[in-house]
Amino acid sequence: MSHKDLTSGEPAGRPKPRVAVLFGGRSSEHAVSCVTAAGVLGAINKDKYDVIPIGIAKSGQWVLAGGDTAQWSLAGKALPEVAPSEQTVTLAEIGGEHQLIVAAPNEVPQELGTVDVVFPLLHGPFGEDGTIQGLLELSDTRYVGAGVLASAVGMDKHFMKVVFESAGLHVGPYVAVTDRQWQKDPEAVRKQVDRLGFPVFVKPARAGSSMGISKVDSLEGLDAAIEEARRHDLKLVIEAGIVGREIECAVLEGRGTDAPRTSLPGEISVAGGGHEFYDFNAKYVEDDAASLSCPADIPDEAIARVRELAAAAFDAVGAEGLSRVDFFYTPDGDLIINEINTMPGFTPKSMYPQMWAKSGLGYAELIDELIHLALNRKTGLR
């Protein structure tokens, strides 16, 4: 497909750019992705864009996901899921253009039309880790969000910390544990963790939405926490517990050569209910389990520093589009970077869009800006 007509955000020969919204996926965060899609599909400006929702079943099958977007929302504690279908969606090049094709057994394939930009709302492995980005790069299809390398680094908490440290950003003490290390010499791992001091947080290195994370207060609970994390990823990161307030900042790519834009920082407060930290249920299931204060009640100089460091973290991993950067603000005023999320939760109640709303950029406008950035960013080396 020729991209020369897309730089204005309005391709010639058709009144509206066509946006394929991808969600679901093969990871344990499948349901979170569906909930994110419900928010985006409900808010995207359909007068401006021709929107095609495409669900990815847990098997990896791509299906056309039409109908009421409410089907992807949380219903109580029931988690939504993309069901497999006899009809399969593929992205193919036909006549020099990228077309979505729907095919079913014993039926003639149907063309859904040219895709101008893909909005991948995929969380976790096989989506947020550079894999879907690599597929879209190979097909020369523009897409929202970070590229292959930034997505991969942002997914791996170990290499993320290595990159941050090399950029001079302050990260907390941690131990990275591979499958081989744990299988070969678990006692050596226990000694490393014991030197960190307790409590510690045991995390899968390449999972999000707080999946598989445990807080461990003593050596006795370590093995069980490690095995729980290994259910999600055989590579782990074990972090020393840090006394501090949880501060977040939303980052949005600048236009052209402009610097990344940052929101007012927000503070996460977990309101008990059995939650020792900001876990999956507090994030997505229980409406009153956590709250966001934005702007965070910290000194003005700390707010400025959070925004500066968030932009630096965005640049350090080479992010594009959007990211959320999380910090600990310690009692002595130090800021310790916890992580960057290159595809943060994007439901209307998620912290990323909430912080932008508090900063003057509404949910629908934020979606529009991300699509604009993607339409005006070429694939390939940049």
From Swiss-Prot:
Residues holding ATP:
193-248
Xref: InterPro entries: ATP-grasp (IPR011761), ATP_grasp_subdomain_1 (IPR013815), D-Ala_lig_Van_CS (IPR000291), D_ala_D_ala (IPR005905), Dala_Dala_lig_C (IPR011095), Dala_Dala_lig_N (IPR011127), PreATP-grasp_dom_sf (IPR016185)
Tell me the ranges covered by the ATP-grasp domain, including all copies: 161-372
The note describing how and how many cofactors are bound reads: Binds 2 magnesium or manganese ions per subunit.
Q: In which pathway does it act?
A: Cell wall biogenesis; peptidoglycan biosynthesis
Keywords noted in UniProt:
ATP-binding, Cell shape, Cell wall biogenesis/degradation, Cytoplasm, Ligase, Magnesium, Manganese, Metal-binding, Nucleotide-binding, Peptidoglycan synthesis
> Know the name of this protein?
D-alanine--D-alanine ligase
